[in-house]
Each structure stands twice: as C-alpha cells, then as structure tokens.
Amino acid sequence: MQSKRGRPRDEGTHKAILSAAYDLLLEKGFDAVTVDKIAERAKVSKATIYKWWSNKAAVIMDSFLSTATDRLPVPDTGSSVQDIVTHATNLARFLTSREGTVIKELIGAGQLDEKLAEEYRTRFFQPRRLQAKGLLEKGIQKGELRENLDIEVSIDLIYGPIFYRLLITGDEVNDSYVRDLVMNAFKGVQATSATESM
C-alpha cells in the first residue's frame, strides 16, 4: 500500500496531493475522503494520483506520516528517563491534537482493512517503538537502567496505557499523567546508582 516506486514525480504535485489528502482528512474524516475529492482539491487528475498510490488509504497514510515524522523527533536530554518522558509526552501530545486523532480513524478503518492495519503498524507504530527501544538500550549502556531490563515489556508498560486511554476509556492523557506513568514504570528498573542519585 506504500507509494508506488520507480515512477519519476514532480515534487510540487506530490506535495499538493499529500496536503490535499491531509486537509480533507482533518476536515471530513477518513470515511468521507475519496480519491476524487483529493484530486479536485489538489487540482490534479485521478490518474496522477494512481501513478504514485494504489488507493486513498495509501495517500492518506503518506500524508499522515509526513506530519508525524516532523512532530515526533527523538529526544536527547542526557538522561534516559527524561528522554522517555519527553518521547512519550510528545507522542501523547501529538495523538491528542487534531492532527494526531487521525490515527484513531486509521485504526478504526484498519479493523476492516488488514492492508491498512499493516501499513500503520509497520510505518507508524513500529518506528515509534524502535525509537523507544533505542532510548532504553542507551539507558542500559549508560548504566542508568538495569542490565537485565526486559525492554519489550517496558515499552508496553509505558506506552500501552496511553493508547488504552485514547482508544478505550477516553480518559485524559495530559503531560502530568504521562510523566507519572513513565516514573511509575521506571520504578524498579533503574540501576541502583541511578535510583540513589534521583
């Protein structure tokens, strides 16, 4: 479902299509967006869109990812714990913004479209997970976290509740909640020296 490869493209037209798709998504929601509407907004033909994308979900996914990448840099504060707090906070802020709520629509649509679900898993969630994994691995290397830390479980403990609130309970996900979440998750996984220094 990713953009089709091997076809030269005009970057201005490509950007116009992605901008049109994203604007329509924010205005009308995933279900109401069509390739026809994207083409009309971008002032291009449907054939131009289909040269580069296989369907509307592929266009929307690319438009969403370009925004997410810009909004979610990998932090480097000098402290592994603070890096994770910042990373998780930035993610929560993005997901609760109007732009970020798009992922909830994509998740919903993905329940009936396995190809779309695979797209957002591999192109949005897995890269964020790899970022978190890298931050935790750095903490172990620096001696701030226990050497025997189960990284995969730690990621689930930190990030899972954010999505649980967003998708299931609807409870608020603010900066204070995310910080408390991370600090509680880190209890017991910090190296002794790091714990004593806090």
UniProtKB/Swiss-Prot annotation:
A Gene Ontology biological process term: regulation of DNA-templated transcription
InterPro entries: Homeodomain-like_sf (IPR009057), HTH-type_TetR-like_transc_reg (IPR050109), HTH_TetR (IPR001647), Tet_transcr_reg_TetR-rel_C_sf (IPR036271), TetR_C (IPR011075)
UniProt KW keywords: DNA-binding, Repressor, Transcription, Transcription regulation
PROSITE patterns membership: HTH_TETR_2 (PS50977)
Domain of life according to the entry: Bacteria
Pfam family membership, one: TetR_C_11
PANTHER family: HTH-TYPE TRANSCRIPTIONAL REGULATOR RUTR, TETR-FAMILY TRANSCRIPTIONAL REGULATOR
Protein known as: Uncharacterized HTH-type transcriptional regulator YdeS
Originating species: Bacillus subtilis (strain 168)
